[in-house]
């Protein structure tokens, strides 16, 4: 993009690319280029997914050490400070009762915090970090959550990598039944196009893209997911500063990505400060969204 003094996402057509997508994926993509699967202008704003870690306190009763860093500590404080509407909940995958209780507790806390600020719509994603032994665990978990908190179940947008990343070693694990209930997203197992196809065969209905795993690979796999009608999300692995802007630019240019993960501000906020001065809409969160329209400069859109 910088070579041609244009945004890199505008350099993905046959005018700039020597080979079509079939060279990187397969013959299903003959005659297609990445410009067909990306936007010419970034989305204006995107909801921000806030991480709720397994050890993160929900209320003051959970706080054992309150750092003197002027940041929110409890989930309720974060919701109030940033106007959060999207929460990514980390679960154990091997402690059934704890997993169910955690989601139910978060829904109870969030419902109070959101009601206090007049918000009626918010969402969850659930990340088991590949700890579930089988699909039966996922199915039983979803059933129990739906029984104990129908609202929490309804707010859940997708489930992320519930079982082992080693798809070839566990062909017996099929996630089709779980995917009938909620999109099931492949994350750690997504290493290339072959892995995407295998994950799809095993019941995954969505993929998670990470800019830090490779920009070109993310674009190609994002194109494949769109062609196959799969759910798409972009995650950032606690990337701060420049790396968060890169992740956001990817999310803002892929049409079917509806939210962006951004937890660097929670755990390592200092690297964000120089960039916040130049792009406040990306780092000063007040309504649960980031203003991605600013990512329209040459190159990747920033800096």
Locations of the language-model features?
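Flexible C-terminal active-site loop/helix
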Residues: 237-303
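Short, surface-exposed amphipathic charged segments that create phosphate/polyanion-binding patches used
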Residues: 64, 140-141, 201, 222-223, ...
């Amino acid at each position: 993009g910088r070579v041609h003094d244009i945004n890199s996402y505008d350099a993905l057509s046959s005018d700039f690319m020597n080979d079509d997508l079939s060279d990187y994926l397969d013959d299903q993509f003959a005659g297609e280029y990445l410009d067909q699967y990306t936007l010419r202008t970034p989305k204006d704003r995107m909801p921000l997914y806030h991480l709720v870690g397994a050890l993160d306190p929900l209320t003051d009763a959970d706080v054992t050490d309150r750092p003197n860093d002027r940041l929110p500590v409890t989930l309720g404080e974060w919701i109030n400070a940033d106007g959060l509407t999207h929460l990514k909940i980390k679960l154990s995958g091997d402690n059934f009762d704890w997993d169910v209780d955690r989601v139910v507790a978060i829904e109870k806390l969030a419902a109070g915090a959101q009601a206090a600020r007049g918000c009626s719509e918010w969402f969850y994603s659930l990340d088991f970090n590949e700890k579930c032994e089988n699909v039966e665990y996922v199915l039983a978990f979803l059933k129990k959550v739906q029984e104990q908190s129908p609202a929490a179940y309804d707010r859940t947008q997708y489930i992320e990598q519930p079982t082992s990343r080693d798809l070839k070693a566990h062909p017996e694990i099929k996630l089709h039944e779980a995917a009938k209930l909620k999109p099931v997203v492949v994350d750690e197992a997504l290493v290339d196009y072959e892995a995407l196809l295998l994950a799809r065969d095993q019941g995954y209905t969505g993929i998670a893209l990470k800019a830090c795993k490779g920009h070109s690979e993310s674009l190609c796999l994002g194109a494949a997911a769109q062609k196959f009608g799969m759910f798409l999300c972009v995650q950032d692995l606690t990337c701060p500063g420049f790396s968060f802007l890169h992740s956001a630019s990817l999310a803002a240019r892929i049409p079917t990505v509806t939210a962006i993960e951004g937890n660097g501000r929670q755990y390592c906020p200092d690297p964000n400060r120089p960039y916040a001065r130049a792009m406040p809409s990306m780092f000063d969160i007040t309504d649960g969204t980031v203003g991605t329209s600013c990512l329209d400069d040459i190159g990747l859109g920033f800096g």
